[in-house]
Amino acid sequence: MNLEITNHFIKAISVILPKNPLRKEDELKLCNINERKYQLLQENSGIFNHFVSDESTYSSDLATQALEEFLSKDILKKDEIDLLVFTSFTPDYLAPACTSLIHKNLNLSSHTLCLDVLGFCPGFLQSLLQVFLALNQPSIKKAVLICASVKSKAIDAQKDKITFLNNSDSASAILIEKNTNIEDKSYFAQKIFSTQCIEETLPYNGLQTNSNKNIQANTALAFSFTMQNYPAFFQDFLEHFNLKKTSFNEFFIHSSDNFSKQKLYEKLNLNFTQDNILKNYGNTTINKLPLELASYAGGGINKFYLEALEQGLPLMHVA
């Protein structure tokens, strides 16, 4: 599906990373891995730091802190929030909704429209689309999109040590304001490949008795799928909207490690540089793209390209 819609303004981004409750020595012992193997993992992944929440910190806690940054710094007033969207694959509960917890924690206005979305790696882009569509409504002028992950709580550190040591828990709050110039456009595209969805990501949590308590993905399947399908999707997106690669100030393409990103950039004929976001902050999953935008050195990007891969399920772009 390809969509051309009104482009709205990303005005501010707040990113929260928890402080690791464990020392490196404790983590290596937990994962049953020695120092030399850990160094090899760092060299291969390009990840030299990661952030894990403590036992009492959950998605709603990090999300509350991210939004509170806007309020405490007078970037936004409570009664200005017309729409609050929360996206995560690690919510505190199925009920009550995390937006209700955030709303209660910060005593937000009763007029704020709240929406909870189940979202994995492309969750930021999927929810960004929903926010952009909502901002076309006359009564919605300012929206906050919150993405949060405490994936560390759903990883078996003994059996999936690489994922645990690369993962970072995080939350982001993105303030998005209405653009009244309807001639200013943004472009979204998504393509779904569901044939191998259960093989790529094993059923996780939920009410079915055959689901797993821990998140586990087939990374080899995800990598081969991406290399096979993404380049054509990338090219189709540009051609459909008559866009040129040279017209973009920056490309932000989600990847969980430097090796995969380098191979993909080679396929796309894009200039690859080592990913400092991965190096300094680890794999922040749903918050990789918000962190990229918040950390962009130039600031004030006029035209950029965002992309996320759902490890073999949706492929998604926004420009």
Predicted regions, residues:
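Condensing-enzyme catalytic core mediating Claisen C-C bond formation in acyl metabolism
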Residues: M1-E55, K159-S224, A232, G300
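Conserved beta-ketoacyl condensing-enzyme motif
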Residues: I10, E55-C121, L238-K261
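Short beta-strand segments
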Residues: S14, T87, L118, A143-S149, ...
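A contiguous, well-structured pocket-lining segment that forms one wall/lid of small-molecule binding clefts
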Residues: N212-L278
